[in-house]
Amino acid sequence: MAGNNNTPLGSSSGLPFPTLKRSHILHCSYHYWHPKYRSVTPKARLIPLNDAFLNYLRADGIILPPQDENPPGADDDSGIYSLSDDSDPDDDDVDPSIQWQEIHAQIKATIEELGGKVAPKLNWSAPKDATWISATNDMQCRTPNDIYLLLKSSDFVTHDLEHAFDGCVSDTEEKSDGEVEVEVEEGKEKEQKQAEQSRIPYHLVLRKYITLNPSLEFRCFVRDRKLLCLCQRDLNHFNFLFGLRDNLRDKIQTFFDIRLRDTFPDPDFVFDVYVPPPHNRVWLIDINPFALRTDPLLFSWLEILNLKVPSCDDDGESDTVRVEMRRGGAERGTENGIGDEESEGGDEDDLDAATTFSFVPEFRLVEHDDPEAYGFATPRYSAHKLPRDVVDASRSGPGGMNEFLGQWQDILAKRIQEDEEGGA
């Protein structure tokens, strides 16, 4: 959900967005929608988080629990470290996981259950902006400490924890004439915000780590339960997509019509899908609010908001007529190791459709002459990254990062000592 963090939130943009309510944000939380669509999502496990763990994520500094001597599936050069690795035995009692040992144990067990490698996220956001600190420079986590390191280094995760309802109104704040009441007492508003944040049922989502082909991930925009438009998520040019465009659009439209259109509680939302070869099955990756905070990628929000929403004509017939058929003998949902063996078999079948369109959603791809179409080496989320010396240390293996952290600790200790002496 943190995809468009460089843009101010709320209605200050002047764009004619529908009113963004707190219930809309909660409906886009992974823990809310995953049970509904589990059979069409990649394999994942959800771990409820308590206040102690959330306080750990919010706390300044990165202190990791002591590392297991031989964590399952971890390489010798994994680059994962604990700040207590080089500490004195007397410091062993500084273990942050003491306050959430059950969660720590659940995370260990879940990593093992999902094959030894997982990709983490919180309710809305994955820590993609923090992969610079990972030894593999991606979301792959083999130990609990890998997960904690990514979560505590991520601005996206901080947004989930501190700003989930920014730009929203409560479901009772909207007046009958459609105008939104504005709180004028800042103290009361701050207190209300803190209370709301504390009521969010935060979860750690651990998804089985698989290598997705980024060229086959797509973002889809829904208004009034109509699929308006869709586009690539990856901003590079892939020539082969143009030959697949019509087939991909049909498959995604059918998936939306049958799976999401009448089952998601809100009429306006944005969803991400993955359509791997042989391109006959659609996987739901994420659901985001139809709001400025969601990155429109190849579109602008002004374009999307100005698109005409297809509606019923005077005769009551829809602009789009579809005849849907369920194909027998379809592949199981665990093909390519993506799906969940525990999903109900009835929801695993592929869907085919004989389709007649009078409204066709625009499917935007990156053109070959786009000046930004070949930025394969361009780093993403650069606004959230740290200085070069930190990045270089993270890339030099465990020795380099441990040395950097030791120097960092020395600097912090020296500054604390200077502050104490100055205040004496």
From Swiss-Prot:
Domain of life: Eukaryota
Region of interest: Disordered: 64-95, 325-351
GO cellular component: cytoplasm
Record key words, sorted: ATP-binding, Chaperone, Cytoplasm, Magnesium, Metal-binding, Nucleotide-binding
Subcellular location: Cytoplasm
Amino acid composition bias (Acidic residues), ranges on this chain: 85-95, 338-351
Residues that, per the record, bind Mg(2+): D286, N288
GO biological process, one term: eukaryotic translation initiation factor 2 complex assembly
Binding-site positions, ATP: K121, W124, A126, K128, R207, K208, E217, R219, R233, D272, D286, N288
Gene Ontology MF terms in the entry: ATP binding; magnesium ion binding; protein folding chaperone
Pfam families: D123
Basic and acidic residues: compositionally biased ranges: 325-334
Family: Belongs to the CDC123 family.
UniProt function note: ATP-dependent protein-folding chaperone for the eIF2 complex. Binds to the gamma subunit of the eIF2 complex which allows the subunit to assemble with the alpha and beta subunits.
PANTHER family listed in its UniProt record: CELL DIVISION CYCLE PROTEIN 123 HOMOLOG (PTHR15323:SF6), D123 PROTEIN (PTHR15323)
Protein name: Translation initiation factor eIF2 assembly protein
Organism listed in the record: Ajellomyces capsulatus (strain NAm1 / WU24) (Darling's disease fungus)
Name of the coding gene: CDC123
